[in-house]
Structures are given as structure tokens and as C-alpha cells.
Design a protein with these regions (language model features):
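Helix-centric, low-specificity signal for extended rod-like, repetitive segments
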Residues: 14-15, 69, 87
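Short coil/turn linker motifs that delimit alpha-helical repeat modules in TPR/alpha-solenoid proteins
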Residues: 26, 60, 97-99
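Cytosol/nucleoplasm-facing, intrinsically disordered, low-complexity tails
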Residues: 101, 117-121
Length: 121
């Protein structure tokens, strides 16, 4: 009888945690899904929706360099290379940036300068 009284709350807690995990996905997975959706929107030509999506990713995770790169890309392709350049310049001082992200950053900055007809930089 005593073991049944202990077993019922344990099972209840187990069900609660399993149910809670299904409803609340991990933040990292959610951001990855949002990033994938943003790329899909970008490819589909839905630039405004992609912009909002990458902006919300940055609001949740300000260390997401890839989202900043895509945000700048959308701005540059939309005719706002100055704002794109500001975003990309702000990433230069980041310490936790991979080599791939550095290459992408410099490529995007070069495209920004090209768009601005500023080849001296």
C-alpha cells in the first residue's frame, strides 16, 4: 500500500515532465527551426518575412552570427547597403566567431562596399 502511494506521484511527475518537454521544445532546436524557416523564406522570395524571422532569432540569441549575416544580406539586397554594412561591421569585434563565419562576414562586407561603389576598403 505504501509503495502504491509513492508510485502514483512518481508516475504523475514523469507524465508531467514528458508532456512538458513535448510542449516546450528546447530553445536551441527552436532557433535552428526558425533559421531554417528564414532560409526557406529567403529562397522563396519572401524577404520581409525572412527579415522579421532573422530579427526575432537575434532577439532570442544575440550571439547567432549567421542570423546577423542573413539580416545584413536581406538589407543589402533590398537596397540598404549602408545599414547592412553597419550590421556586418558590428560583428568584426566578436570573439566567438568561427573561421567560416569570418569568411562569410568579409565576403558580405565586400559585397556591401561593392554595392556602395566604395572599392577603397
Amino acid at each position: 500500500m505504501f509503495s502504491v502511494l509513492i508510485l502514483i506521484p512518481v508516475i504523475g511527475l514523469l507524465i508531467y515532465f514528458l508532456y512538458y518537454r513535448k510542449l516546450k521544445p528546447h530553445k536551441v532546436n527552436n532557433i535552428r527551426e526558425m533559421y531554417a524557416e528564414g532560409l526557406d523564406m529567403l529562397v522563396s522570395g519572401k524577404r520581409i518575412a525572412a527579415y522579421k524571422n532573422f530579427k526575432s532569432i537575434i532577439n532570442e540569441d544575440s550571439n547567432n552570427i549567421k542570423a546577423y549575416l542573413r539580416l545584413g544580406q536581406i538589407l543589402r539586397e533590398g537596397g540598404n547597403a549602408i545599414k547592412a554594412l553597419k550590421i556586418h561591421k558590428s560583428l568584426i569585434l566578436r570573439k566567438k566567431i568561427t573561421n567560416y563565419e569570418k569568411i562569410e562576414l568579409h565576403k558580405n562586407m565586400a559585397l556591401n562596399y561593392y554595392e556602395l561603389d566604395n572599392f577603397d576598403k
